Structures are given as C-alpha cells and as structure tokens.
C-alpha cells in the first residue's frame, strides 16, 4: 500500500476499482471507479473544474516553477531534447532522463537538490494516435520537481511530494480536493522503477508522482542507494484541463490552428462532436478494435453517420498532426538533428512524412514550409532557440517535402514490384513487414502503398500502430561492444594502470614493471606512456626493452581500468622492469591529427551552422576523417572558408588546456557541446579546451592526447569532402608534414598536367580548356563517323532465320558503338535478335522479342547476367558454337 500523511489527514479513503483492480485514494464516498481512462469518461470537456484565469502555457509553466521555488527548489534550465549525454537513447522522454544514469546511480551529484524544471520531451510510442485520440502528443513539456535522497542526506519523500501536488492543484490552481484522485501504480523507465501516484481530475491524468528506489536488472528490481522523487506534471494536459476544449490540440495550439484553418479553407469542426469523440476515444483502444471500427462505434454513440464523421475528422486530424509534429520536429532540428535514414534523424523524417501523408490524404494542398513558418512564429516566445534555427528548419523541411514528392512519383512502379514479389512467394497481399521494408527502403507511407495496391486490385491492411512500431525500432542506440581483447577475468584483479600518456603526452620513453603476461602476447604494466586506442585515435606502437630481449608493441587497448599492450616476439617475464619506447614520430603526428580534428569541427560549425555534430571520426596517418551531420554537400567556397578558419586558428597558436572537471561543473560551464565526440562514462570528465577562457575556440570532453598549442599542428589541409550517407558528410584531411607532402604531390601533379596540356603551371587552366575543347571536337567527329559506321554495319548484318526471328552474332569491343549498331539494326527489323560479343562480355538486343527465355537458355551454357525485356548483358567464357546452338534452341 502506498500512503501519504496529507491524504490520511485530509480524510481520503482508499478504494479498489472494480474494473482495473487498481487501488486509489478519494475524498468522495460515492466514488466507485479509479477516475482514470478507460474506467471513467472525461468530465472536463466543455466543463473545466475551475474558472482560473490562466491565459497561456507560458503563464502556467511560470506558476508551476515559482510555486516550487517558493518551497525551496532551485529552478534548473531545461536540457536539450537530444540526449547526447546518454548512450542508450536518442531523445529525452521525460525530465528524469536529464539525470540518468549519472545522477540516479549516485555517480554524480544533481545540479541542485531539490530542483524544479520544465523539460521539453519527445515520445513516439503513441505517434499513430496523435490527431485521432484528442489527447496524445509526440512532444510535450514535463514540468517536474525532483529530490535525491542519499543514505546520509534526506531531502523529502512520499509525504512531502504528495502534499506538494495536493497544494499545487488546490491552492495554486483552485481545484477542489474532492475533484482530485490519487491512483496507486508502479512506474518503470530508463532502467529505474518505483511505486507512484497518478494524479487524476475528471478522468484526466495530470501528474505522476514516482518514488524511485529500484534499478531494473535482467527483469528484476534491485534496491538503489538513492531514493529519488521523480514527478511529472503535464504542462499541456493541465492546460487542457483548465480550458476544457474538445481536444488537447485546440487548447495547446489554438491560435495556430485558427490561422491554419483560415489559410487552408478548412472549416472549424463542430465543438460538441469533437468533444464527444475525444471522450469516447479515451475509453477505447483503436489498436485492439481497429481504427475503422472505432470510428463506427463513436459515430453510433454520438448519433451521426460514420462516413460523415470520417469526413469531419480527416482534415482536423491532418491539422492536429501538423501542429504537434511540427513543434516536435522544430525542437529536434533546433537541437542539431538532421532528417535522415538513421538515428534521431530517422525519427525526425518519420514525423515530417507523417505530416505530409496526412495533409495529402485530407486533400490539403499547401507548401509545408509556409505552414511550419506560421507555427514557428507562435513558438518563438517560449522557445527562442527554435526561432533562432528558423532558416535551417525551413530549409530542411523544404528539402524533405521535395524528396517526398519524388518518392510518391515512384510509388506505382515500386508497389507493383513489391506485389509481384509477394505473388512469387505465394502471398495474396503485402504483409506488415513488407510495408516496413517499403517505408525504410523507399520512404513510401503504408497508406499510399495501400491506395496504389487498390488500383491493382489488391487490398492491403495497414496496421493502426505502424508508425509507433517504426519509432520503437529506431528509438534506442545500439550498444557498442566492449573490448574482447583479453578476458576481463584474467586482468580485473590487477590495480589500475597509471596513465603516463595523460600526465605528460610528450613522454617518449618510460620505465615500468611487468605485472602480468596473458597468452604470451598481452602485457600489463604498472604504468605506461603507450596510449590505448580510444576516441578514434589508434593505440601507440613501439618497443618494450628488458634485460635479455625486446618485444615489439603493435597495439594498445583498454580493458576496463587496465591497459593491455599487444606484443610481437618474446614478451618480457612477469616482475621484470622494462623500458618502453614509443614510436614518437607516429604519436606526434596523431596528436596533430587529434587536436586538428577539434579545430576542424569547430571551423565547420562556424561556417555551416550549429546543427553540425560529429557523427564519427578516425585519426590516422597520413590522413584522418571527420564525419559530421549535414544535409547537403558543402560548396567549394564553404570548404575553402572552413579551411581558412581552421588555419587561422592554427596560425593564432592558441593554447590547448586539458583539465579534469566534475561532470556537473563542466556541463554547467560549457553545455552539452562537450559531447561532440560522444558520451563520456565518468563522474569526472577530461575537458580539452582550445583557446583562452575568455574566448575558447573549441571545448570538448575528450580522452585523446593533444598538443600544447595549435601552432604545433602546422597546417590543416582538407583533401576531400563527400556524402557518405543521408545526412552525413565526411571530411578527409591531413595535418603537419603529411599536409605538406600532400600539397607537394598536388604541385607535382599540377606540373605534369600542365606539361601534358601544353602549358605551364601558371596557365594550366587555359591549357586544359584548350585540350578539352579539342577533345570535344574529336568526340563530336567520332560520334558522326560512328553513326555512319553503325548504319553501314546494320545494313550489312548477316542474319540467320530461326523460327520467326532472325539471329545475328557480331564481335565488337566498343560498347557505345555496339549500342548504336543495335539501335539502328533493331529499329529496322523488329524480329531481329542481335548478339554482340566483346572479349568475355556478351550483350543481347532484340527488336521486340522477350529476352528472358533467351537468357534462361544461355544460363544453361554458362552465361551470367540479366537485363530488361529487350536487352540483357553479362559475361560468357565458353565457345561461340555452343553459344549459337543455345540461341537457336531458345528462338526456335
């Protein structure tokens, strides 16, 4: 039983709901049910419980924050919606995500204790219900107060938390105590769990009070050393309660919806119908009974025609989806998410395409950019960071809309192929897995697939929770496998290796004692200056010298707190002293690359924008790579400016500071830009700052070895920029002497090019233009003579009559010429089958005959290849006679 003094003192009764069997607390003796959906209907739509003058979300949020500030809570600035400090999820789904796992595990103290926050959060688990249910959102603000109770420090727990909730709703918002029900439940999320109260008013859950004291491990609850108060007050839910509008969207997005309806010519829906529909939707699960069945049941309850209800709902649903999804997408893009096919970008693209799909199905025609821009103007007061990213948001949305339109053009062809494939495997229609594949591979929404399939006489059932399934599959990050170089059990008992490479990155040699040798090639020392691979920087190489021998170090890896040296040759015996000598030239080059990487990514951000985040990096010699999130290939001018900025930072000889800082202190000072290189799993983090405190050029949490100043880099030269994936651009670059060697090689090649073109290095461009002009003229003449030759050859072909077709076999090594001959010959004679041989390559052209039976026959004699209906290409290494015999069999 979960009880609180305020409830007992106020006369609350504990009852059990006969429907859901949950226990709940109420002041009403006549209350039978728990007060939650679906056990009871909403009772506030059209009849809010109070007449409180709360005119905006802004005001409600501020009243909540001030309420808890007056009660000793420190107000904390909201965190980003992208959880860059976590290695398990992409997006923040609740305020407690801000403090998981570091604070909740006890590894790091909270930024304040107790604290209050209003955290924008994103959950896509019910994305299919958005716009339909009247209450579901993908983006919402979780207002919350948190307290962290340690064994030696008590802050507050169940009694105080429940009393705060009681006072906020009764005294701050004026809701009578009899309206408030406290329902007992169990909460679990993010690896933690605890008992909770769900706070309910007239059928609507407006807050959850979680008393977190468990960690979930392998399906079991393990007691935490901390007892954490984790509350969540739904900003939008409470505002809806106070307004009593038909749907949550009308309360939260009212002004935007009014303008959108006016712009698009969509009539305002009947408030009474929408309100009743929300009430009934709240009491049923469309995923269980089916969406279409839900519409019919609701229409029957309201007393209207089902078809009419769908016609009313469809445009409103599209606008509700637009309002919710566009705010969520704007939060994501403003926080650096680029729509793409992976990670958080996948989720952003999913939301944009759901908007476009719903608008299309509702018959609403308008540029999405214009609609979202209208919404951004509404959001700029509460979310200035979103307004600051307006240009980027609109550019990305426009790009996504253009891509989507191209995708729809391909729908008939793609769906036909999918249906053909389904028939080949004996299926009458497309399965949910087929729909997922069509979405992930081609971007086709299942509703569009179903419409296209219907024109081909096939009914396709679209799961009502299709997008929720997709979101769930892409919501979590893949765990990186831990090092398996050496079994942990073989070294875990050893003391932590002293890391000399951090104490002095310029140390070239050192003395150490051999603690253990594993499997004859893995050496553990008590201390080492050999850097262990990490953060995209390779491990050092070198040699371990000892009395009577030496072993070559070919790799260095970290296994937990132990550093393991991989050696070739006879390893040193355990217990002896060794002298480690690092390949300094290689290490120093890698230090230049690593510090250069930090300089380069900051330069890229300054030119391309703050949405740039590192998507991967590998420091190596002679070249390194840096992958960043960006939606298009940078222009040559942008690349040149990036390179100029980077080398300006090098020439400025900025100092490089490395400092160990408490995690909270570092995050408070520098923000989450610290995690450009990824999550750092530690209570204290190693911060690398380039430039002075007054004006740092770049700051990152990093475990690599770095230079003392940027001047040591010498030069940063970008060698290549390419798109390696949707939303990811790769920079290949080099530094120092390797950059000089690269530039010298370019100079050498430039000189050779000038010589070949008949000019000098000073006028090589003009010389190449002249050469290109002559080449174009030669190409034009070749095409002219090739066409003449093709006509002549086509006229003189010797063809053999085989059945109704004519068979001709010729030898031509030039593929372009072969195509011209084929076009000319098959254009003259539709019954011609022309086979062109060139080396072991074989091409088959027909004037109209289906090439498939021919290919099938040729495969029996060793041909490998395929093609379209009238053309096939592949390889054949057999003799000509066997080939011709197979052709005759196929055509006769």
UniProtKB/Swiss-Prot annotation:
**Know the name of this protein?**
Alanine--tRNA ligase
Say which species the protein is native to.
Pyrobaculum arsenaticum (strain DSM 13514 / JCM 11321 / PZ6)
Q: Which HAMAP family match?
A: Ala_tRNA_synth_A
Q: Tell me what gene encodes this.
A: alaS
* PANTHER family for the chain: ALANINE--TRNA LIGASE, CYTOPLASMIC (PTHR11777:SF9), ALANYL-TRNA SYNTHETASE (PTHR11777)
Q: What does this protein do?
A: Catalyzes the attachment of alanine to tRNA(Ala) in a two-step reaction: alanine is first activated by ATP to form Ala-AMP and then transferred to the acceptor end of tRNA(Ala). Also edits incorrectly charged Ser-tRNA(Ala) and Gly-tRNA(Ala) via its editing domain.
Binding-site list for Zn(2+) = 594, 598, 702, 706
Keyword annotations: Aminoacyl-tRNA synthetase, ATP-binding, Cytoplasm, Ligase, Metal-binding, Nucleotide-binding, Protein biosynthesis, RNA-binding, tRNA-binding, Zinc
Is the Isomerase keyword given for this protein?
A: no
Q: Which SMART domains match?
A: tRNA_SAD
The entry's cellular-component GO terms read: cytoplasm
Per the entry, which co-factors are needed?
Zn(2+)
Catalytic reaction annotation = tRNA(Ala) + L-alanine + ATP = L-alanyl-tRNA(Ala) + AMP + diphosphate
Task: Write out the domain note.
Answer: Consists of three domains; the N-terminal catalytic domain, the editing domain and the C-terminal C-Ala domain. The editing domain removes incorrectly charged amino acids, while the C-Ala domain, along with tRNA(Ala), serves as a bridge to cooperatively bring together the editing and aminoacylation centers thus stimulating deacylation of misacylated tRNAs.
Q: Which family does it belong to?
A: Belongs to the class-II aminoacyl-tRNA synthetase family.
A Pfam family of the record is: tRNA-synt_2c
